[in-house]
UniProtKB/Swiss-Prot annotation:
Keyword Glycoprotein: yes
Secretion signal span: 1-16
Residues modified by glycosylation: 142, 164
Keyword annotations: Glycoprotein, Host-virus interaction, Inhibition of host NF-kappa-B by virus, Signal
Naturally occurring in which organism (per UniProt): African swine fever virus (strain Badajoz 1971 Vero-adapted)
Protein name from the UniProt record: Late protein I226R
Induction (UniProt): Expressed in the intermediate phase of the viral replicative cycle (immediately after DNA replication).
Similarity field: Belongs to the asfivirus I226R family.
Record has Glycoprotein as a keyword: yes
GO biological process, one term: symbiont-mediated suppression of host NF-kappaB cascade
Origin organism lineage: Viruses, Varidnaviria, Bamfordvirae, Nucleocytoviricota, Pokkesviricetes
Known function: Plays a role in the inhibition of host NF-kappa-B and IRF3 signaling pathways. Mechanistically, promotes the degradation of host IKBKG through enhancing its ubiquitination leading to inhibition of both pathways.
Amino acid sequence: MKMETFLVCLFHNADGLHQQIQEILYLLRMHIYETNLYLKQELSRLIYPNRQLSFVLLMPLSLLRNWDDIEYLTDVVDDKQTLHYAANLLTNYVLHLSMFQKLTKPYFLLAVKRVSEKLNKRQRHSFYEVLVTSETLNNYENLSKNILNTLMFAVRYVFKPTPNYSEILAELEKKNKIHHIIFNMVIADFAQIRKQQMDKHLCETNNELRQECKETIFDLKVVGNV
């Protein structure tokens, strides 16, 4: 089943979903505590044999509208390799749902936050790198500003405990992965805006860039009030 077909089916005809996806929806609705081994085993059985199903598992979150289910989902994932994969899934989640105007930011951000809390400082850098350099974002210049702003806002949650941007950029610079999206995220950090209003070094000499900074800051403030 094509992803676009699946999404239409998911949002308009949940009864027509594949049997395995129905099982996942059922398990997520059971409201069983994360200590329940049976539920963990069942989720593992459905998730790990097929990575496409791992991706699908994130999709129903906007339908369930239940914080407990979403928190449980991110708690189930323990190993770091899977967490890195989860970063890609979260990115795809934003992009695909945006296409159907079904994006609900709080639910996406909670998943990002819960995953990032499991990682130490170095692992958060890696998680961030996966999030912003995902294959899905290789053509980031063609993405709408709404999607980019949502991703940037999510990235702030990953580093909320210690948002040391100079260190993050230094790490990424070593790997030649400085992207436009990273630049936007750095200049649009709320604390930095309050202290400096805008990064003079980057913006004052370039009218076009300065205007883009202002637009990004405004958009992020709007997103922050959602």
